[in-house]
Amino acid sequence: MSKSYKMKSKSYVCGEWVEGELNGTQVNNPVTGKIICTVSSAGVNFEKMTQYARTVGGLGLGEMTLHERANAIKNIAKYLLTKKDHLYQISSKTGATKLDSWVDIEGGLATMFSYSGIARREFANEKFIVE
């Protein structure tokens, strides 16, 4: 098996991008067999991640109103939309056609935009929902 390039995939952990400590598992292009990257969670402190999510991420979201959260989702979708050509390029390495990928990429982004709009239209601009 020839290799076109090899990179270590990173994970977003406790506010920063980190690589696993070991070489990890190879991720191969299913069409060509070439190595795309390696991925490893060795050395990642999952207990610390859970605590970070509860004390930093969760608190941060709790401070946002529902409209602010909806706008954050919309802004992420807008950013990802600027990267859609790159996302199609990556998706092609899975063996998917552009049409296959369209459902996941543009369909997923459309869902994000839709949920954002629904939240802003149907929920009060508060930090909570009264049911």
Residue ranges and their predicted role:
Residues 1-131:
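N-terminal Rossmann-like NAD(P)+-binding subdomain of aldehyde/semialdehyde dehydrogenases
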